[in-house]
Regions:
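Class I SAM-dependent methyltransferase SAM/SAH-binding core
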Residues: 48-100, 109, 124
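A short SAM/SAH-binding and catalytic strip from SAM-dependent methyltransferases
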Residues: 109-122, 145
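Conserved class I S-adenosyl-L-methionine
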Residues: 1-47, 58-62, 78-82, 86, ...
């Protein structure tokens, strides 16, 4: 399937389905990248900041704590409902990252925490981010690092490559490990109208602390979207092999009564010309 609308519908229905699980499953991982993202983007008191693909609103909440004015948008109504529940003092709207409703030059900063690879047309989202930024404003976003730089991504990727049937039909979307090459990322940003020479591209690593060895597999299967769709289309036999391989790999990261799995992401910041 190569229709971008198919991928958008796939992602939208997926996040509507698992939004209620995000806080309990993924928050302890993805929120670890917010503070370094805000530092890299130099978010300051009094700024106007748009949190794109905001999910439950964690980035917007961190922005607000710095004294900046945050607005969050997400295409998932279920995510927006949770963001409003968790952070009642912040404005959250349903919206499309690839067709923002905001006027030109509205925000000082546009931020996106692990959202680009969930969009059918990341280039459109970059162009829209530039459009709504004020002159000299900054775009900051995070991307999962490629498996060879990120132990968690590698163990999951290795298990899937070894045991999954990759011929199952899934909607065609952007690469999961999007813009992992610095030159590719800079070129995409320049094509969207940003000042490519201003780009910073840093790797940041954290430990994802989980209670059991099967937690990561269960998270991907039941609280993911792209990974969940791939896993759901496997035979019971293949799924069992993937589960076993993931759990065996996680065991090496045992710490105390749980596990601490290293995982890396890229923090990318660029200025509007």
């Amino acid at each position: 399937m190569n229709n971008p609308d198919d991928f958008t519908r796939f992602e939208h229905s997926g996040w509507e389905r698992v939004a209620h699980k995000y806080n309990d499953v993924w928050a302890t991982l993805t929120t670890q990248f917010i503070a370094p993202l805000l530092r890299a983007a130099n978010v300051k008191n009094g700024m106007s900041v748009l949190d794109v693909a905001c999910g439950p609103g964690y980035v917007a909440a961190a922005v607000q704590q710095l004294g900046a004015l945050a607005v969050g948008i997400d295409f998932s109504r279920e995510m927006i409902l949770r963001a409003r529940e968790f952070h009642p003092g912040i404005e959250f709207r349903e919206g499309d990252a690839q067709a923002l409703q905001s006027a030109d030059e509205t925000f000082d900063r546009v931020l996106m925490n692990f959202g680009l690879f969930h969009l059918s047309s990341p280039d459109k989202a970059l162009a829209e981010a530039r459009r709504v930024l004020r002159h000299g404003g900054t775009l900051g976003f995070t991307l999962w690092a490629k498996p060879e730089e990120s132990p968690y991504s590698k163990l999951m990727n290795d298990a899937i490559e070894a045991h999954a049937d990759m011929s199952v039909e899934l909607p065609s979307g952007p690469p999961y490990y999007l813009f992992t090459d610095r030159t590719e990322c800079r070129n995409a940003l320049q094509s969207a109208g940003f000042a490519g020479d201003s780009m910073t591209f840093e790797t940041f690593s954290v430990n994802w602390k989980v209670p059991t060895a099967d937690f990561p597999f269960e998270a991907e299967l039941h609280a993911g979207v792209r990974s969940a769709a791939l896993l759901a289309r496997q035979s019971p036999e293949r799924l069992a092999l993937i589960r076993s391989a993931v759990e065996k790999s996680v065991e090496r990261y045992a710490v105390g009564e749980g596990y601490a799995i290293p995982i890396a992401a890229y923090i990318v910041v660029v200025s509007k010309k």
